[in-house]
Structures are given as C-alpha cells and as structure tokens.
Amino acid sequence: MKLFNIILSAALIMGLVTSCGSGNSKKAKDDGFVSIFDGKTTTGWRGYNKPAFPAEGWEVVDGTLHCIESGTGEAGNGGDIIYDTKLSNFELDLEWKIGKGGNSGIFILAQEIPNEPIWKSAPEMQVLDNDNHPDAKLGKDGNRMAGSLYDLVPAKPQNAKPFGEWNHIHILCYQGTVVYSMNGANVVEYHLWTEDWKKMISDSKFKDFPNVLNPAKEGFIGLQDHGNDVWYKNIKLKILQ
C-alpha cells in the first residue's frame, strides 16, 4: 500500500504534525506521538453516550485497559468507551490482546447516536480471536477476521497473533484515506467519501446507517465492549493537520 507512505512522508516533510492538546497526555516525544492512556487511570476516556467512564465492566490493570468478560454479549456490562476528544486527521498506535473466543473492535470518527450502538456510527477495525470465534469463518474472504475493516475489507496479509498474545496496531486517518497496519504490515486501505466507498457500503449490511455511508469529518476513537475479555495498552496518538 504505497499511498500510506506517500501521505505520511508528505505530512512529515510539510511539518503538519502537532502535539495532542489533551490534558492527560504526556509530553510529546520526538516522533510526535503522545500517550492518551497513562496505564493507571481512565482520565480522558468515558463511556459511549455517557458522561463518565463506566463504573463496571472495564478496569485498569497492569498498565492496560481491560474489558472484563461478562458473558452477556455486546455492550452487556460496561459498554463501549471513547477517547473524549474529536479527531479528524491523525495516527493511532496501540496494542491489543484478546481472550480465548473473544471479539472487540476499534472505531475511528465515531459519532454518539442516542440509543444506538457505536458500530452504526463509524468504521470498525476488527479485534478477534481468529481461531476460536465463529465470526472468523463468516463474512466474505475473511473480512470478519482480526485487522479487517469489519465485514467490508479483509486484512491481507492476515497476520494476527493468537489469543493471549499482543498485537501491535497502527491506524492512519488522513483526509479520507485510512490505512490499517498490524504487526508491522499494512493490511487494509480504504478511502472515505469516495464513490468506491459509497458503493461498498451500499452493497453491505451498513447501507441503512448514514454515519457509515457518509462518515463524519471528525469523531471519536472508540473501543468496543463485546462481552469478552480484551486488553488495550500503549495507546498513543499523533495529530495531523
């Protein structure tokens, strides 16, 4: 995916990178990334469609954000969470680890729609135990496997690590171009607000969700509570303008 390198190089050469203004972020490093999760508190995060961080269902443990297995299905306990700053052009870098048979997701440009789940509002990067969750065998050409644009574009190469192991993720969102990288390889690229995007969504189960068909220009980063154990750590952000 050569476009990723072209866009990123242009941003760096033109000096478009700025530091994130979040109050809980650590001082920017030389690479422009700042931490948006300090590994000790939930400062800067809150529940989706909620004013505060969930009182149960999520915990900070051993430097991670842990969604606790509930056995009650999607958003059955704490619910989805969001980083409480709207973003437009950025790079997101983090690590995730899934429990056996687990499912979760990472959202960008998410919107808060009352009484609706987060997945109806934004593109989702799939987080999954490919070996033990049935979703891995559904969809088309592996587009429900880890690292994929969920149910739309399969991650290729499919290089997710098994449950219990850490996966390193990088997401670039810049002027409508989105690139997912997993464990050092670019695995998905798509282009928002284009005719190709609109056709892909119109032919999918998301066709009736206007915020997916025509995503917002800015929105929240979200982490999904799908009722399964999942851990996130080393969550860092670089703002691109």
Question: Predicted regions span which residues?
Answer:
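Carbohydrate-interacting regions of secretory-pathway proteins
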Residues: 20-241
